From Swiss-Prot, chain B:
Protein's name in the database: Trafficking protein particle complex subunit 3
Organism placement in taxonomy: Eukaryota, Amoebozoa, Evosea, Eumycetozoa, Dictyostelia
Coiled coil: none
The keyword Endoplasmic reticulum is annotated on this UniProt entry: yes
SUPFAM superfamilies given in the database record: Ligand-binding domain in the NO signalling and Golgi transport
GO BP: endoplasmic reticulum to Golgi vesicle-mediated transport; intra-Golgi vesicle-mediated transport
Record's subunit section: Homodimer. Part of the multisubunit TRAPP (transport protein particle) complex.
A single Gene Ontology CC term: endoplasmic reticulum
Provenance organism: Dictyostelium discoideum
Keywords recorded for this protein, A-Z: Endoplasmic reticulum, ER-Golgi transport, Golgi apparatus, Transport
Protein's job: May play a role in vesicular transport from endoplasmic reticulum to Golgi.
Annotated compartments: Golgi apparatus, cis-Golgi network; Endoplasmic reticulum
Length: 281, 186
């Protein structure tokens, strides 16, 4: 069922990468990168060019992979309860870190260990200062708000940007994950792995209606609103533009999993955000 | 001096809160793409990126001074080492090198080995040597240094996206700003 939906997406990504300036996931792009981790990263990048079926754990190029017979249910279960599967995955991550250490030298072991602990269930990747990204994010929002003729257009732009980023980011994050057989598994991935990567915490609440087409995600301390201060004299008390990008992230991620959806959000009180995902079908 | 700041850079980077660099790379890439669509002229995109970087830099310097514990630098040479070994390491997790000083010690080249902004990025031929993809870094440096009373001019002279082997930023110290007495206090 999901295969016909997934293949066109991947093809589109490949075609787009050849016609304009944009981020391209693939071996060619990796070849240009000066990343120290290239010898480790390149095989994973190459696998992104294969069909959706090949993205399953069975075909993963990582030699120490322990998920050959796992399905996504076991994977998600391992996240909830740190049992054998979770521990094995951590072992795999640590082994991968060890492979990298030879290239990075002695100063890095502590950093690598932190990296493993911060994201035990995702592909190893570089880290930057969180404040660096947040400064950039604030300036990006400001730039787009100023360059748009009205607020609605700005929100559309932010949503589109978020869609692009979410679509690509989730492709990187799910390299080691088997295909999701059910919609709920995809949403759980967003709540756990995706949210941890972007906000360093899991979503605080997940609700769904009994038909399963609507999901409500609650984040009680939304990271990107934490540092905003309140000015009672300001004419604009609405900070929804800081959240619109995140709605786009979710929409893009779900799109890459083959589910087209509408994402709306509500800022309830200081820093509490509720995202509603409605699946289109 | 270089080793001392190398160690400090590593210590500070280990302490700060960190995030996946791919989110940063992809978000920046999406923004640059949007700017190219919005502005017809590539030169305008470069200017816009630099302006955005300036606005980030004037805020970033507060974070830098608070977290790193560095005091006032004695001269521009020390400033350059601090930027390369502590600043770039702390915020981007990369090593940068200072070289090519001129005779007056007012100009140097900063070489960035492993710029996280350009992971996954390819430039079509018509943009090579025209679009300075990482120009936001020039703006950040200018903004940050202006807040510590150094007026500088930063330009990219080499970029790996334009088929050069490394990324290099030329930094020229134009003047040291003097303190102004606040209005109404003189």
């Amino acid at each position: 069922m999901s295969d016909p939906l997934s293949n066109p997406t991947i093809n589109t990504t490949n075609v787009g990468g050849q016609t304009t300036t944009q981020n391209t996931i693939g071996g060619v792009g990796g070849g240009k990168s000066n990343s120290v981790g290239t010898p480790y990263t390149t095989p994973l990048q190459t696998s992104a060019y294969t069909t959706a079926n090949s993205l399953s754990a069975t075909n993963s190029p990582i030699p120490n992979h322990h998920m050959i017979n796992s399905n996504s249910s076991n994977n998600l279960s391992g996240m909830v309860t740190p049992g054998g599967a979770g521990l094995q995955q951590q072992q795999s991550s640590i082994t991968s870190s060890t492979n990298n250490l030879g290239l990075l030298g002695q100063q890095q072991p502590q950093q690598q260990q932190q990296q493993t602990l911060l994201q035990p269930f995702t592909t190893q990747s570089r880290l930057i200062s969180a404040s660096c990204f947040e400064f950039f994010y604030i300036e990006m929002i400001d730039c787009i708000m100023k360059s748009s003729s009205d607020k609605q257009q700005a929100h559309k732009k932010l949503d589109k940007l978020g869609f692009k980023v979410g679509h690509r980011l989730v492709e990187r994050l799910s390299l080691d994950t088997a295909l999701f057989p059910e919609l709920l598994d995809a949403v759980k991935f967003i709540c756990k792995v995706f949210w941890t990567t972007v906000f360093k915490k899991t979503i605080d609440g997940l609700k769904t209606n009994h038909k399963g087409g609507v999901f409500v995600l609650t984040d009680s301390k939304f990271q990107w609103l934490q540092h905003l201060s309140f000015d009672s004299s300001a004419s604009n008390k609405d900070c929804s533009e800081y959240v619109q990008f995140t709605a786009g992230l979710i929409k893009g991620a779900m799109s890459n999993f083959g589910f087209k959806c509408i994402v709306t959000f509500d800022i309830q009180q200081v820093s509490t955000c509720v995202f509603t995902i409605k699946i289109e079908s | 001096m270089s080793k001392k700041y190398d160690k400090l850079g590593n210590d500070v980077f280990n302490k700060v809160e960190k995030i996946n660099s791919e989110l940063f790379t992809l978000t920046y890439g999406a923004l640059v793409t949007q700017l190219i669509k919005d502005y017809e002229d590539i030169e305008q995109v470069n200017i816009k990126l630099e302006q955005m970087g300036y606005n980030i830099g004037i805020r970033l310097i507060e974070e830098f001074l608070a977290k790193s514990g560095i005091g006032r630098c004695s001269d521009f040479i020390e400033t350059a080492e601090v930027i390369a070994k502590v600043g770039f390491k702390m915020f981007l997790g990369v090593n940068a090198h200072v070289g090519d000083w001129d005779a007056n010690r007012k100009e140097f080249h900063l070489t960035i080995e492993d710029n996280p902004l350009i992971d996954f990025v390819e430039l079509p031929d018509q943009y090579k040597h025209k679009l300075y993809y990482s120009n936001i870094l020039c703006g950040v440096m200018r903004g940050a240094l202006e807040m510590v009373q150094m007026k500088v001019k930063c330009t990219f002279v080499k970029c790996t996206l334009s088929d050069d082997s490394t990324s290099e930023i030329k930094v020229v110290l134009e003047e040291v700003l003097s303190d102004m007495i606040p209005v109404g206090y003189d």
